[in-house]
Amino acid sequence: MRIFYLLIFLNTLVLSVLAQKNTRGKVVDQDENPIPFVKVQEPETGNVCYTNDQGEFVLNYFESDSKLTFTTSGYDTLRLALPYDKYTTVFMSAKENTNPYHMGFMVGFLDFKNKNKNKNLENMTYFLGESDINRQLQMLPGIEQGTEGYSNLFVRGGEVDQNLMLYNGTPIYNSNHIFGLSSVFHQRSIANTGISRGMSSAKYGGRLSSTISLESSKTGSYSGVKGELEITPINAGIYIESIKKDLSYFTLSARRSWIDLLIPAESRQQSVNANIYDYQIGYGKYLKNGDKLDFSFMNTRDLYFVSLQTTDTANGNIPITYGITQKWYNVLASVNYTEQVTSQLKRVHSIHYSSYKNKNDYSQETYDFNLLENPLVEEKLQRGIRDIGLKTDWEYAFSNEHHLSFGWQNTFRQFLLGANNLISKNYPNQSDIDTIVGNPNYQTSIESSFYGEDKYFFSKDVTLDAGLRATIYSFDGYTKLVAEPRFHLTYFLQNNDVFKAAYNRHNQFVNQLNLGRSGSPDNIWVPATGEILPQNSDILEIGYERKLGRQFSGTVNAYYKNMQNLSAVSNLNDASNPEKDWKSSVVQGSGKSYGLEFMFQKSKGDFTGWVSYAYSKSVRTFPDLYANEFLFTFDRPHMLKVYGNYTNEYSIWNFSFNYLVGSGQLFTLPIGKFRDINGQLQLEYNTLNNYRSPLYQRLDISAGRKNINSS
């Protein structure tokens, strides 16, 4: 009976909380792009809340005869009366002289996230005419490209595989075309980009360095169809969107390289061929009850083929053809169902699929006219990774002081560590061979996470995000339970300056073995095991942001990151050989990085841009590689980045430039040589990464002309 009364009490309590009066809605700009971190306040009572990343808000205990104020940096303050229990779209106007073509990143006042609308990414200088999301991110302090010309992302002393890159919530395992010279994302299909450089909410996990969120265009302030065609020195592309306002949307984005089409078809099949493509499809429908269904699909592929002919003079000038083919591709798909349970409670159910596979084929065919069939040798090596994810995320506006988010996430991840199909046939006096070396079967790991987070508004000046993420990981009999606390404190000073401090802990249960170069398609994704332990990191960061007049803003950030169980390859030949156990070629160590970052932006007027400077240091300790601590390969203590853009909505010309100057890249060079007791010449090294190349500088300048329709 006591249990019965207790259940009645709890049910009454829950219903009373859910029945609180409130007003809710979404804050957008004039193009209906969501505006995050807008302060929504009821002046009469002091009740206040902030919009989330989707621009949505819920304000409780609302007095029907009062007006709400909407304030945020860069937009005119708005006062508006809103009705009870209705979802209202609130439009805000940018302040006078704000340049809509500004490419600057908006810094989050309530967290450490940098966000940007990609509407005018084409105004930025770019490589061979290709607007590139990754190169845009490389212009932020603390994010480096590594090797010159590549679109890799090394965030605050971390490796490429330590970035969680999400396309509409689905992880992508290789984001590069052309061996890293270009990213796989068509800039026109990406509406918003957000990056958290280590400080992310409890909702995200599984990587040490960053969370990068790429969202495709899903809304529009009109009903109709529009499209774009483009051609660059690399690709030809098309973008189509069909929008029925408040009902549904459909988007299609596709690119393909075109230079190979100039080569005769016979040559492409027999001698040389290289092409890339990617396409993205999005569809969404708004249901009658206010719920929403979204579908997203993405496919990318690179293909490179070379065939060489030679003559075996030792055996009667017999022609021999050698062929090398490399192909890698991504396939991503996701379905999201957004459900508004009550005016205060929203949940999103999601399922996603992500697959990456790399194939390397080698063939040797001998044209011996004395034989009925040509002798043939082939090697077909495959490696890859794929996962299926299920998750449910809840957002609950419990009160104006407490905004809760919680949920669970399940990922079934499968690894193809290396399967080499060896074929030999049609050789005289030899039996045909068709065998597989390595393991052709996928090996499965399971990663289950539960998280909860409370955005607690102590007062109008102080906000605390306190979260906890717990993950259970299992693979091949190895099980690990980890807890990841997340704390973000925000303090608004009287002059609207912002001070922030945060602590995050992260764990990573996948590693990418670098077989020569970070970001290469040949690198192998491997699971954490009982021998190769999961990576983890602890990160501390403080930040200060200030508005400088109406046109300028500045930020300063300092961070310290400690990393454990980092992985490195000790023997490249054994690690790349599918016949051998990859774990025997991997050693683990630790690392740390720290730095100080400055960023100064101008967002208004015809000329906009930013200047950033970062001082940083990143070191590694791998006792099995070298006894002492050494610098991380992509450690660059000093880096200055300048971006400028001159344009306005009436000008037919756009001018922009990027300038980077900083410390050179590290290499390992011998300091001497000697002969051992057997008389063999040996090289002497004093440490790893002991030589730094000269000062690095790069300047990119672009000018563009656009047609303006005066009708």
Give the location of each predicted region.
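Conserved C-terminal beta-signal and adjacent last beta-strands/turns
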Residues: E241, G284, F632-S711
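Surface-exposed extracellular loop regions of Gram-negative outer-membrane beta-barrel proteins
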Residues: Q309-A314, L422, N495-I539, Y560-K583, ...
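Short, acidic, small-residue-rich periplasmic hinge/interaction motif at the N-terminus
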Residues: Q41-P43, T71-Y75, P83-T125, N134-R135, ...
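Periplasm-facing N-terminal accessory domains of Gram-negative outer-membrane beta-barrel systems
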Residues: L18-P100, Q145
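Periplasmic N-terminal accessory/gating domains of Gram-negative outer-membrane beta-barrel systems
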Residues: F109-N163, G169-S200, S217
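Gram-negative outer-membrane beta-barrel transporters
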Residues: Y560-N562, K580, S584-I671
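Face-selective signature of the C-terminal outer-membrane beta-barrel domain
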Residues: I281-L303, I324-Y478, F492, F552-Y560, ...
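Outer membrane beta-barrel strand-and-loop segments of large Gram-negative receptors
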Residues: R383, D387-K391, G438-T444, S449, ...
